[in-house]
Amino acid sequence: MGGVQQLPQADCILLPLPLEQSGLPLAQLLGMAKPGALALGGKVTDSARTIARAAGVELVDYFARPELTVYNAIPTAEGCIGILLERRSRTLWGAAVLVLGFGPVGRALAVRLAALGARVTVAARRPVQRAMAEELGLLAVPLTDLAAAAAAFDTVVNTIPAPVLTAQVLAALPKGCLIVDLASKPGGTDFAAARRLGHTALHALSLPTVWAPETAGEALARTV
């Protein structure tokens, strides 16, 4: 309780990621802080911002910082590869893998899968992202062509926080496809349709803290 008792004197308060894991209700925590204090938390909601304003506390979402996204991309990619190795009955070498999205996580994952010998195709919306993927020796398709391209892949990883793996796209995948969705809740996969079609669909969240907690902590420290 020592830390909580020191809240009224603190100029800066570091809260967890996600913010809801603070232990005590946020209103109680920030109500103990002095007006004008700076609170840093992860995945800050609108309701949390309302609570902070009422307490006179400035609340900053460090999870929204682009540098933290880049730092976390590597442990996320490595954690995803660990899941694929656990769940697949064959090597990633020679596997046809579809990666949806080419932001920091998609890029980090795609190049590492290719380094392991996987035949990686990136599906991205923007032409510049597809060009960057091809420049790295990867294949690339527009997101609008997902349903037409899906039959070639038995392993799919999504990094896009939007409904991209729809029932139509899932129906075009080979039965029993392994799908790992890395996007924030609710993800980009129609999980009910995936189960109905006989696929294995996993929503893998917070991989840096699960697979590389020390690295995740260092990344957070560098950000805040």
Model-derived regions: residue spans:
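Rossmann-fold NAD(P)-binding glycine/threonine-rich loop
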Residues: 43-64, 182-224
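Rossmann-like adenosine-cofactor binding region
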Residues: 18-38, 133-209
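NAD(P)-binding Rossmann-fold cofactor-contacting core
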Residues: 1-2, 116-136
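Conserved Rossmann-like nucleotide-cofactor binding loop
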Residues: 105, 128-129, 185
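Glycine-rich adenosine-cofactor-binding loop
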Residues: 1, 93-114
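A short, well-structured beta->alpha microelement
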Residues: 1-9
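Glycine/serine-rich phosphate-binding loop and adjoining beta1-alpha1 elements at the start
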Residues: 14-94, 204, 223
